[in-house]
Amino acid sequence: MRAVIQRAKSGSVTVDSKIVSQISHGLVVLIGVGHEDTAEDVEKVANKIIKTKLWPSVDGAQQWKQSVLDVGGEVLCVSQFTLFAKVKKGQKPDFHNAAKGPQAKELYDQVLAKIQAALPEGRTVKDGVFGAMMDVALVNDGPVTIQYDTKNDK
């Protein structure tokens, strides 16, 4: 499973000219599910999203001291199979390593559930529309953008 974790001042997802999800301060996360991914990958990626320290200390003196939970941030996730694109041969991307729709949706939904379980009461994980063409907007804070692949986490 792959994730692009972006610290954001704001983010939104628009489908058919309608905003379906939006956040202010927090994370915008693109998540790709691979055909070899399992529940173990779900656990790993959800933990990275909620626990990675991407914000400075409260006094601003030290970088990388607080997670999205620590700063009271929101989380907006967007499914994105194109994170598994290969472009080694030719010009056309190859998506064979991405999970097919039903498997991808099941594991993606599990990631959302794990993140939701970690959020304090009253806060909900936001997401786009699985499989839809979406306009994803964000104001990247920093910019801070982290790539994570559960198969290459050693």
Swiss-Prot record:
GO terms for molecular function: D-tyrosyl-tRNA(Tyr) deacylase activity; tRNA binding. It catalyses: glycyl-tRNA(Ala) + H2O = tRNA(Ala) + glycine + H(+); a D-aminoacyl-tRNA + H2O = a tRNA + a D-alpha-amino acid + H(+). It is found in: Cytoplasm. Keywords: Cytoplasm, Hydrolase, RNA-binding, tRNA-binding. GO terms for biological process: tRNA metabolic process. Its EC number is 3.1.1.96. It comes from the Eukaryota. GO terms for cellular component: cytoplasm. A motif (Gly-cisPro motif, important for rejection of L-amino acids) lies at residues 142-143. InterPro entries: Daa-tRNA_deacyls_DTD, DTD-like_sf. Disulfide bonds: none annotated. Belongs to the DTD family. An aminoacyl-tRNA editing enzyme that deacylates mischarged D-aminoacyl-tRNAs. Also deacylates mischarged glycyl-tRNA(Ala), protecting cells against glycine mischarging by AlaRS. Acts via tRNA-based rather than protein-based catalysis; rejects L-amino acids rather than detecting D-amino acids in the active site. By recycling D-aminoacyl-tRNA to D-amino acids and free tRNA molecules, this enzyme counteracts the toxicity associated with the formation of D-aminoacyl-tRNA entities in vivo and helps enforce protein L-homochirality. A Gly-cisPro motif from one monomer fits into the active site of the other monomer to allow specific chiral rejection of L-amino acids. Homodimer. This is D-aminoacyl-tRNA deacylase. The gene is DTD1.
